[in-house]
Amino acid sequence: MDQLAQTEKYSPFRFFSAEQWSRFRADTPLTLSEDEFRRLRSLNDPVDLEEVKRIYLSLSRLLSAHVEASQLLFRQRQAFFNAVDIVKTPFIIGIAGSVAVGKSTTARVLKELLARWPSSPKVDLITTDGFLLPNEVLRRENLMERKGFPDSYDVGALLRFLSGIKSALPDVRAPVYSHLTYDVIPGEFVTIDRPDILIFEGINVLQPGKLPQDGKIVPFLSDFFDFAIYIDADEKLIHEWYISRFMRLRETAFRNPDSFFHRYSQLSEEAARAIAEGLWSNINLKNLRENILPTRARADLILRKGADHLVEEVALRKL
């Protein structure tokens, strides 16, 4: 985060080492067991319960404070409008960052920690994968090699979904994506029914659109977020994690004959690694540099990872 921390005096962020951040846990209890955490962890992600204690319990405590403040503001607005029939809207947490940086593990761990607060809030988790355009459309538009780039998503559907959630509508539907077939599953949806908290995870969720010249209101996804988190790491580390994950998948999920990537499991290790390097260089690295990393400074909190996926530094936006 060198560019963000050049002079903290003029930065919109406060910076903490992992050790400093861990002290903010206070008396927040660890409510996850080793077995539960193991089920939440993504493939090739070595994060353990010690990291949850060190980083995520403090983050859970911080988010609890933000949710509590949001609820207080809601009650004050009710009084301001002299209205009691206004429906409380969900608190939305956006999580962004590169492919292979550990967003999914972070999102799942936070979901479990937040749901176990004493108030027992209803917490749901949605990823942007289901909002990718179907492969048939991507092929027709010559976008298959830009899958994951902003133009490969159904932005209208994303905005309608988040608008429905923020409007406290019941039974808002999100499409479902299959990592086995590498495609949206036709006609399959997950229903989100007025959660207290929604975690919305995806590589480009902090991506702003082009500002209209005529001043019309054009919402960005992040306009619906109450708190945004960016998972950060050095480019070289993300590259290592991506290649390592690809090679692990080659030995596991890719061996399924129904897998979109099954053909890669038939290649030699050298050939498979060359494919992975090409996918990284031509697609994922390009997307990171052009679209994902530039959104980092739009987050409220940045978790900067070092080796072994362990957080080394935390940046929190000043109030």
Curated annotation (Swiss-Prot):
GO terms of molecular function: ATP binding; pantothenate kinase activity
Entry EC number(s): 2.7.1.33
A cellular-component GO term for this protein: cytoplasm
Pfam family, one: PRK
Alphabetized SUPFAM superfamilies for the sequence: P-loop containing nucleoside triphosphate hydrolases (SSF52540)
Keywords carried by this UniProt record: ATP-binding, Coenzyme A biosynthesis, Cytoplasm, Kinase, Nucleotide-binding, Transferase
Keyword field contains Kinase: yes
Cross-referenced InterPro entries: P-loop_NTPase, PanK, PRK/URK
Main location: cytoplasm
Recorded catalytic activity of this chain's protein: (R)-pantothenate + ATP = (R)-4'-phosphopantothenate + ADP + H(+)
Chain residues that bind ATP: G97, S98, V99, A100, V101, G102, K103, S104
Family that this chain belongs to: Belongs to the prokaryotic pantothenate kinase family.
Protein name in UniProt: Pantothenate kinase
Source organism: Mesorhizobium japonicum (strain LMG 29417 / CECT 9101 / MAFF 303099) (Mesorhizobium loti (strain MAFF 303099))
